[in-house]
From Swiss-Prot:
Catalyzes the isomerization of sedoheptulose 7-phosphate in D-glycero-D-manno-heptose 7-phosphate. Keywords: Carbohydrate metabolism, Cytoplasm, Isomerase, Metal-binding, Zinc. GO terms for cellular component: cytoplasm. Pathway: Carbohydrate biosynthesis; D-glycero-D-manno-heptose 7-phosphate biosynthesis; D-glycero-alpha-D-manno-heptose 7-phosphate and D-glycero-beta-D-manno-heptose 7-phosphate from sedoheptulose 7-phosphate: step 1/1. This is Phosphoheptose isomerase. It comes from Dechloromonas aromatica (strain RCB). It comes from the Bacteria. Residues 36-196 form the SIS domain. Substrate binds at N51, G52, G53, E64, N93, D94, S119, T120, S121, S124, Q174. Its main location: cytoplasm. Belongs to the SIS family. GmhA subfamily. NCBIfam families: PRK13936.1.
Length: 196
């Protein structure tokens, strides 16, 4: 086995996935940036959730907004719903794993807030339930998916934004999700700070 060639192939595949995605995803990413920025300017907040690697992505996103991305600026209201082990285990034990995010959305979300819902497959039950809860609270949903968008792609409303990576391999989708998250953070900063 030629490990160097294998590593190089992974780099090439990852780069190609991102290049394949740009034409399809640039406009909805720009729309998501504008929607998120308007939410934050008007005193709203962004709740983010996902499972596994997508949980890490939701935490990464919230950290970039609360702290900073690449430029100093005021703190921005973002909460990752994946971090409180007591809440997650209490809801998972007393209700079900499918409700670990939806109950938090109902408790923390308000009209005008945004749910950033991350699911590589678009079929995660607890993300689907979180989206339903967000819709109940008149929140916008920005869904970050792959593999055609799954059930999540089918349940989004006209005011929601679907950022679907045109790929089927989980690793490539996750790598592109991170790039999308960085694009969101960069765009929010550009609008808030007036950067060209």
């Amino acid at each position: 086995m030629d490990l160097i060639a294998r590593v190089a192939k992974n780099f090439e595949d990852s780069a190609q996935t991102k290049l394949n995605a740009v034409d399809m995803m640039a406009a909805p990413i720009a729309a998501a940036i504008e929607t998120m920025t308007n939410c934050l300017i008007n005193g709203g907040k962004i709740l983010a959730c996902g499972n596994g690697g997508s949980a890490g992505d939701s935490q990464h996103f919230a950290a970039e907004l609360i702290g900073r991305f690449e430029a100093e600026r005021q703190e921005l209201a973002a909460i990752a719903l994946t971090t409180d082990s007591s809440i997650l285990t209490a809801i998972g034990n007393d209700y079900s794993f499918n409700q670990i995010f939806s109950k938090q959305v109902r408790g923390l979300g308000h009209s005008g807030d945004i749910l950033l819902a991350i699911s590589t497959s678009g079929n995660s039950g607890n993300i689907i339930e979180a989206i339903k809860a967000a819709h109940e609270h008149d929140m916008h949903v920005i869904a970050l998916t792959g593999k055609g968008g799954g059930q999540i792609g089918e349940m989004l409303r006209d005011a929601d934004i679907h950022l679907c990576v045109p790929a089927d391999r989980t690793a490539r989708i996750q790598e592109t999700h991170l790039l999308v998250i960085h694009c969101l953070c960069d765009g929010i900063d550009a609008l808030l700070l007036g950067v060209e």
